């Protein structure tokens, strides 16, 4: 779910920046170095426009290790319905991957 939202957001940004109305799936794949650079540049451009400006903001760069870790995590995630510890109500989905919990309401 989180990856879907991220891809839709990136697709919208890439459509605006390229001025196109239709994209092939290959145009959105983050395995493409051109797309990686476009994402990084857009992210860093947006961060430069922060007001007031941050004094210690680091420049973002692409990390292959993190890409592999995220890909593995996204294919191995097992969703479970989460319940509130006191009320017992169903409160959303929890994905477990490599000992990390991701909670989506």
Curated annotation (Swiss-Prot):
Under the heading Gene3D superfamilies, the entry gives:
CAP
Q: What is its main location?
A: secreted
**Which protein family is it in?**
Belongs to the CRISP family.
Q: Where in the cell is it found?
A: Secreted
How this protein is processed and modified after translation, per its record?
A: Contains 8 disulfide bonds.
Q: Name one GO molecular function term.
A: potassium channel regulator activity
The protein, known as: Cysteine-rich venom protein VAR2
Q: Which InterPro entries match?
A: CAP_sf
Could you tell me what this protein does? Blocks ryanodine receptors, and potassium channels.
Which UniProt keywords are present, listed alphabetically? Calcium channel impairing toxin, Disulfide bond, Ion channel impairing toxin, Neurotoxin, Potassium channel impairing toxin, Secreted, Signal, Toxin
